[in-house]
């Protein structure tokens, strides 16, 4: 579904830059007449905007979607800045060399004309875009949120929209606060609503469930970390899902040792209060 969301983000930037929606609504409001084309030529200046080519785009979160947005924006002539302190090796290899990978998110707030968020919703990221962050942004910034609804402090956002600090807010999450707020473009969660995305998601879900059942590997879980020990081709493998508390690993290894089982390889990953343990090549 990453490509479907990427296309929505690009569409959102274009719609926020040029008042295409306003122009369409104006045209539909006009009575059919022979001089409609002439009238449109006269009124079109009301809907003028700017091009995104040459503008600075800041991307917070360089996962599957963030990387696709970054690479596509480069091809559209944008100057792209990416921030992700936890970027994966695969994502890093997929990024265009023309993308500036920065170490402080404040640089994005300070310098970028467009800012798009692509991070998971955690306690640490809830309302990550608030009054202080918005205050650091350029006047007239365009903010896009196609990740999670609660990443943005909407009270602070609405105030910034009214004051003109934020030029446009584009989001895929409809709620009563932003749906009728000024200078917002709100879509009804259409990011992955394409035939291709739905097919790809179904195939991906089946493949990842099979990988877990056959190999114990976890990918794209909501409450567990990605944990990949490859295919299970050894004598055996034990996968243990457990609470992320001290001394758990020592208990597992002692239990196996007492049973006369030797562990040749072991992988442990944690996410929040949950962990997964792989022990493989049991002897």
Model-derived segments and spans:
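Rossmann-like adenosine-cofactor binding region
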Residues: 85-177, 193
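A conserved regulatory-domain signal marking ACT and ACT-like small-molecule sensing domains
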Residues: 219-281
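Oxidoreductase and adenylate-handling cofactor-binding alpha/beta cores
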Residues: 6-25, 73-78, 203-217, 253-257
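Aromatic pocket-lining residues of Rossmann-like dinucleotide-binding sites
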Residues: 72-73, 137
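N-terminal Rossmann-fold NAD(P) dinucleotide-binding loop
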Residues: 66-67
């Amino acid at each position: 579904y990453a490509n479907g969301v990427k296309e929505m983000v690009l569409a959102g930037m274009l719609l926020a830059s040029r008042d295409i929606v306003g122009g369409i609504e104006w045209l539909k409001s006009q009575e059919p007449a022979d001089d409609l084309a002439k009238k449109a030529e006269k009124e079109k200046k009301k809907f003028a905007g700017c091009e995104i080519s040459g503008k600075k785009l800041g991307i917070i979160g360089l996962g599957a979607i963030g990387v696709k947005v970054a690479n596509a924006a480069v091809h559209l002539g944008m100057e792209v800045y990416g921030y992700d302190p936890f970027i994966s090796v695969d994502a890093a290899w997929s990024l265009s060399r023309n993308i500036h990978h920065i170490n402080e998110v404040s640089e994005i707030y300070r310098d970028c004309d467009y800012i798009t968020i692509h991070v998971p919703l955690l306690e640490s990221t809830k309302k990550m875009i608030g009054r202080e962050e918005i205050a650091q942004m350029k006047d007239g910034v365009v903010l896009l949120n196609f990740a999670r609804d609660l990443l943005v402090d909407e009270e602070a956002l609405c105030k910034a929209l009214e004051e003109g600090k934020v030029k446009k807010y584009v989001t895929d999450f409809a709620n009563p606060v932003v749906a009728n707020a000024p200078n917002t473009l709100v879509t009804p969660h259409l990011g992955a609503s394409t035939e291709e995305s739905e097919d790809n998601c179904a195939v991906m879900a089946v493949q990842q469930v099979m990988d877990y059942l056959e190999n114990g590997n976890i990918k794209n879980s909501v409450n567990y970390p990605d944990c990949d020990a490859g295919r299970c081709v050894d004598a055996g493998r034990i996968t243990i899902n457990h609470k992320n508390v001290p001394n758990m690993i020592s208990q597992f290894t002692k239990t196996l040792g007492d049973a006369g089982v030797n562990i040749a390889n072991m992988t442990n990953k944690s996410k929040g209060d949950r962990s997964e343990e792989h022990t493989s090549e049991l002897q």
